[in-house]
């Protein structure tokens, strides 16, 4: 049962006895609610009712953390001050906002610096602002009046369905409000929590004001926010998730860039989300953010206060500690992955979005670099200016940064090339490309590439009145569409920045001689953004399956299959030569449904290598052939199970001058 449902049932039952006092009788129900939520946090937070007088009066309760308790004792250590603040409880008939302004709460605040005020139906946090002054922070309202509250309590399941997710997220944030905020993963959790609140506010709300933006996004990205028969709302869910990701990662990106500009200013300087657009360098994200952050769009959806809370959260981050971790190259593992898992785990699963371990990224890029030298007679490998690279599903930019790092190492090894950093920057601008369809990872990819170049001493130039700013070759687009020239006049988009993004991405697709395509394509079938142009990529893998091979039931719907089709047909067909290196679902190696696909690989490529990493929960039970444990290679500290499907790394080379018989090799490994 949901914690809110339990709480409402308990307060309803207490009131129904007719013997309850207006306030104190409900303390146990409130404590149960807070303890149920508090035990899910790390460290856990425990509510203790009726605290001793420490010089400011007798708080109705306090929120403690484990280190404040004696071992094996339910009582706090003598003299322990509640680490997460105290609680002031009033009856449901009283006004929590008036209580928060009273002398008693001010006395508590003067001693404890954080007070949660509640009348059972309203919850209001009194904390401190950047200057250390008393201020009302976040609030949550379960019902507008006492009468409405008791009606809601009489229908606990219905009320919990309407409020449960947002309310529990609110309580978690309250209990974490006084905790030090230094680690990227903790900041990510708060950002995701606010984003979830925002997403819940716009679910089911008509968004006619955003129809123009929706149509422009579909045109710019080369996709349709479509539903399916099984889930008609799937595309709408993706669209709304895209909007929320854009708003919150736009704010986050602006905060990061604002910090870079204020390194030498007073640590007490404050970031303001309303000025975020001034700090965003990527035109597409800047335009999206500007459209979404207009008061006419935010205020009717109730998103202004959520963004105000987000601003307060970012302003209490210890920036020195945060950025010492963030810029060590762990931004993705410790920030984006926890964000997406906490924000929208369903979308993450639908799109098959998983963090790629750095060991895999390093291995694949190194293999590609070696094959360029050995198979295509390019002694400088990735550093050769004729080598154009594309990660068609670049996510947060891990492969792009590793390509640039490898490129820089080659230039340095040639004798300390004095222009090495400049040449790496030139590559990032003009021949190392990434495509991404989700705004949040797209923003992080730009941040990662930008930080890498900055650390090399070749930062991207910012926009000035006299010149256009520089940006990495990472584009927000559907990688699977837009490769063919339009049959009619190109549609003009309402927003120039979106048109510029679309046109730049299409220039890469149609005009750049892509030689290397690598990455970690999505694994799962996701029809929420399907387009007819995508399905054409898979058709060659179905030819003859029924008539020639007698395979009547087959499944080629997973997105990674489309990316193989893209690499084989679109890119190899355009340039006559290509190197493909993907880590993907390993089903294509042996599943009967993929027999035509395997035969096409053997006919279309000259050299092929496959590293089977196993790790499948269904086929191998996550065991090696020797019976040893075989966890997924995608297991991380924050996702210990990894993914269920087995994986494989492919490396396939097609040369302009074809060989008669392809060379192939394979290996089987755990992981």
Q: What spans do the regions from the language model cover?
A:
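SAM-dependent methyltransferase catalytic region
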Residues: 322, 327, 331, 341-611, ...
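Active-site metal-binding core of divalent-cation-utilizing nuclease and nuclease-like domains
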Residues: 41-81
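Charged, often low-complexity linker/regulatory segments
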Residues: 1-50, 266
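Short, hydrophobic/amphipathic alpha-helical patches that form generic packing surfaces
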Residues: 32, 242-259, 337-338, 447-454, ...
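Segments forming glycine/polar-rich beta-alpha architectures that bind adenosine-containing cofactors
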Residues: 232-265, 269-274, 656-671
């Amino acid at each position: 049962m949901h914690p809110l449902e339990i709480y409402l049932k308990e307060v309803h039952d207490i009131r129904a006895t007719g013997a309850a006092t207006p306030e104190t009788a409900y303390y146990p129900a409130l404590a149960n609610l807070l303890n149920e939520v508090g035990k899910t946090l790390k460290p856990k937070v425990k509510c203790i009712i009726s605290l001793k007088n420490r010089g400011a009066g007798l708080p109705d309760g306090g929120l403690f953390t484990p280190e404040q308790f004696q071992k094996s004792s339910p009582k706090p250590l003598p003299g322990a001050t509640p680490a997460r603040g105290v609680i002031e409880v009033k009856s449901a008939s009283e006004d929590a906002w008036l209580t928060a302004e009273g002398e008693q709460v001010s006395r508590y605040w003067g001693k404890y610096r954080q007070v949660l005020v509640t009348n059972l139906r309203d919850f209001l946090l009194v904390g401190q602002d950047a200057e250390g002054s008393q201020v009302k922070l976040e609030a949550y309202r379960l019902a507008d009046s006492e009468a409405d509250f008791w009606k809601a309590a009489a229908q606990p399941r219905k009320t919990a369905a309407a409020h449960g997710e947002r309310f529990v997220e609110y309580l978690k944030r309250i209990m974490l409000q006084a905790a030090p905020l230094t680690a990227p993963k903790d900041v990510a959790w708060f950002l995701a929590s606010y984003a979830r609140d925002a997403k819940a506010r716009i679910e089911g709300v008509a968004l006619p004001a955003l129809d123009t933006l929706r149509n422009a996004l579909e045109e710019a990205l080369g996709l349709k926010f479509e539903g399916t028969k099984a889930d008609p709302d799937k595309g709408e869910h993706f669209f709304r998730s895209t909007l929320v990701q854009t708003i919150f990662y736009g704010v986050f990106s602006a905060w990061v860039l604002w910090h870079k500009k204020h390194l030498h200013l007073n640590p007490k300087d404050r970031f303001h989300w309303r000025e975020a657009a001034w700090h965003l360098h990527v035109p597409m994200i800047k335009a999206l953010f500007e459209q979404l952050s207009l008061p006419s769009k935010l205020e009717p959806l109730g998103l202004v206060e959520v963004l105000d809370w987000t601003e307060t959260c970012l302003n209490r981050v210890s920036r020195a500690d945060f950025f010492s971790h963030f810029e060590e190259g762990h931004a993705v593992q410790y920030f984006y992955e926890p964000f997406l898992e906490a924000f929208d785990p369903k979308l993450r699963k639908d799109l098959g979005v998983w963090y790629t371990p750095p060991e895999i990224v390093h291995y694949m890029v190194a293999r590609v670099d070696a094959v360029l030298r050995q198979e295509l007679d390019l002694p400088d490998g990735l550093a050769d200016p004729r080598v154009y690279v594309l990660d068609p599903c670049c996510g947060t930019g891990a492969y792009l940064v590793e390509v640039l790092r490898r490129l820089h190492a080659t230039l340095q090894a040639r004798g300390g090339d004095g222009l090495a950093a400049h040449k790496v920057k030139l590559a990032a601008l003009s021949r190392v490309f990434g495509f991404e369809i989700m705004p949040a990872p797209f923003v992080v990819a730009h941040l990662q590439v930008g930080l890498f170049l900055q650390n090399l001493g070749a930062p991207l130039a910012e926009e000035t009145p006299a010149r256009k700013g520089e940006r990495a070759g990472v584009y927000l687009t559907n990688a699977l569409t837009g490769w063919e020239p339009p049959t009619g006049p190109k549609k003009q988009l309402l927003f120039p920045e979106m048109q510029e993004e679309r046109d730049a991405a299409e220039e890469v697709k149609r005009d750049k001689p892509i030689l290397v395509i690598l990455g970690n394509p999505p694994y799962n079938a996701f029809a929420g953004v399907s387009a007819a142009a995508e399905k054409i990529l898979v058709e060659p893998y179905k030819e003859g399956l029924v008539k020639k091979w007698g395979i009547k039931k087959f499944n080629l719907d997973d997105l990674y299959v489309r990316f193989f089709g893209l690499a084989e047909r679109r890119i190899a067909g355009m340039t006559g030569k290509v190197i493909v290196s993907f880590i993907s679902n390993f089903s294509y190696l042996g599943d009967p449904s993929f027999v035509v696909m395997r035969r096409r690989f053997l006919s279309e490529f000259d050299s092929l290598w496959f590293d089977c990493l196993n790790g499948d929960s269904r086929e191998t039970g996550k065991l090696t052939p020797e019976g040893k444990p075989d966890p997924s290679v995608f297991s991380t500290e924050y996702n210990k199970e990894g993914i269920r499907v087995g994986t494989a790394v492919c490396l396939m080379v097609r040369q302009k001058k074809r060989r008669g018989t392809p060379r192939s090799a394979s290996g089987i490994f755990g992981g």
